[in-house]
Amino acid sequence: MRKAPKLAAVMTCCAISVAAALGGCASSSDTAILNTDPPEKMYADADSLMNRGKFDDAARKFEDLDRSHPYSAEARRAIVLAAYAYYKAGKTPEAIASAERYTVMHPGTKDAPLAHHIIASAYFDDMKTADRDQTATRKALEQLKILRSRYPDSTYARDAENRIRIAEDNLAASEMETGRYYQNERNFVAAINRFKTVVTEYQTTRHVEEALMRVAECYMALGVVNEAQTAVAVLGHNFPESKWYQRAYALLKSEGLAPAESNDSWITKAWKAVPKLSLGGPG
C-alpha cells in the first residue's frame, strides 16, 4: 500500500512533462503559422524578394502574409502575386492552385484578369505536340476564352487572342492526326467524327481545308455521295485555290460527280448559309 503514493507522484510528473511538451509544440507551431510582422512590411519584403528574382521565397512570403493577416488590405493581392511568383519559379501546380483560389474568392476584381492569365499561361506552356495528350491545351483555351469574353479591355486580352489561335490550331492538328489514323485503318466513321470536330469547332484554323477534303474521301468510301459532294462544295466555295479542293474535286470527277450542296447536311449547317456555287472545277 505504501507504493501507491510513489506511483501517483510518477504519474503526476509524467502528465506535467507531456503537457509541457505539447504546450511547447503548440507554441512553436503557432509561431510558424502566424507572423507578427505588420502586413505592409511582409508585402514589401515579398515584393523585394520578387524583384531580386527570388520567386520561390517571394511566393512563400506572400502566402505567409495571406495566412497571417487574411483580412488586411494586402492579403487579397498577395494571393495572386504568390501565384505569379510560383509561375516565375517554374512551379506550375502551385501557380495554378493559387491563381484558381484567387478567381474563386475574388471573381471580377481588378486582379482577376491577371489570375486567369497566370492559369492560362501555365497550361499554355505545358501544351504538347499534336500526337500527345491535349488536356493542358484544352484547359489553356478555356482560360484564354474567359479572358477574351469577361475582360476584353484588359492588358491580357490581345495576347489571349493570339494564344487562342495557337491552341485551337494545336487541337485541330491533334484531331487530324487521329482522324488520318482511323482513315488509314479504314474506320471511316471514326475518322469522320474526328474531321467533323475540325470542321465544326476549328473553322478558322489551317487544318479545315484538309478536314473537308478527308470528309469527302471518307463519305465516298462509305458510299454516302451527297455528303461527299457537299463537303467538296463547301471546300470549293471557301477555299477555291486550295490544293485540297483540287484533290477533292478530282475525286468526285473520277466518279462522274460534281460538287453539290445539300441543305440538310451537317456540313452546310456548320458553315451556316453557304451560297449556291458554280459547279465548275478549280481555276
Feature names for model-found ranges:
Residues 2-7, 20-283:
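Acidic, polar-rich low-complexity tracts and alpha-helical solenoid repeat scaffolds
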Residues 11-21:
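Bacterial N-terminal signal peptides
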